[in-house]
């Protein structure tokens, strides 16, 4: 059984990681542990590189905390231009897989508050009245009318980041 450490306590991220690992390695093949670790970047990262650095830092911090695991996984959400997206970073003892999620264009009224220094989650919670929306459907769920959620978009990126771990060509 694979021991997988999720460098997050966010239920939407954990759900995406668990589902993707079960799809790739088989139902019941993984034990998931969740840990809160620092990203080393601002609460609301801007740009692809800062966001990816946050995910890489979370993986490194999770590895230091639980070095006996088989996989360490981090999902870091950020803002790039006028859109929100995330980076997924997965490592095992010998390799790394990374993938960037789909992007969601954000309305100007939301971007204005984020650019003033607020994190997207609290801005969206105020806008929607949904407490801790970032731990639930997120802006993605709101602006896609529930057709997608944070977890569903993260799930796809986790599947992509897992590619090196089950394909010999890597």
UniProtKB/Swiss-Prot annotation:
Q: Which GO terms describe its molecular function?
A: ITPase activity; magnesium ion binding; nucleotide binding; protein homodimerization activity; ribonucleoside triphosphate phosphatase activity
> At which positions is substrate bound?
8-13, 68-69
Which cofactors does this gene product need? Mg(2+); Mn(2+)
Q: What is its EC number?
A: 3.6.1.73
Which Pfam families does the annotation name? Answer: NTPase_I-T
- Biological source species: Escherichia coli (strain K12)
Please describe the quaternary structure of this protein: Homodimer.
Among SUPFAM superfamilies, the record links this protein to:
ITPase-like
Tell me the enzyme class. hydrolase
Record family assignment: Belongs to the YjjX NTPase family.
Q: Name one GO biological process term.
A: nucleotide metabolic process
| Keyword tags | Antibiotic resistance, Hydrolase, Magnesium, Manganese, Metal-binding, Nucleotide metabolism, Nucleotide-binding
Sequence positions that bind Mg(2+):
38, 68
Function summary = Phosphatase that hydrolyzes non-canonical purine nucleotides such as XTP and ITP to their respective diphosphate derivatives. Probably excludes non-canonical purines from DNA/RNA precursor pool, thus preventing their incorporation into DNA/RNA and avoiding chromosomal lesions. ITP and XTP are the best substrates, followed by GDP and dITP. Is not active on dATP and dGTP, and exhibits no phosphatase activity toward pyrimidines (CTP, TTP, UTP, dCTP, and dTTP). Also seems to be implicated in the resistance against the thiamine metabolism inhibitors bacimethrin and CF3-HMP.
Q: Summarize the pH-dependence annotation from the UniProt entry.
A: Optimum pH is 6.75.
What the record says about activity regulation is: Competitively inhibited by ATP, GTP and TTP.
Q: What is this protein called?
A: Inosine/xanthosine triphosphatase
On whether Magnesium is a keyword of this UniProt record, the answer is yes
Q: Which reaction does it catalyse?
A: XTP + H2O = XDP + phosphate + H(+); ITP + H2O = IDP + phosphate + H(+)
Cofactor binding, per record: Binds 1 divalent cation per subunit. Activity is maximal in the presence of Mg(2+), while Mn(2+) decreases the activity by 20%.
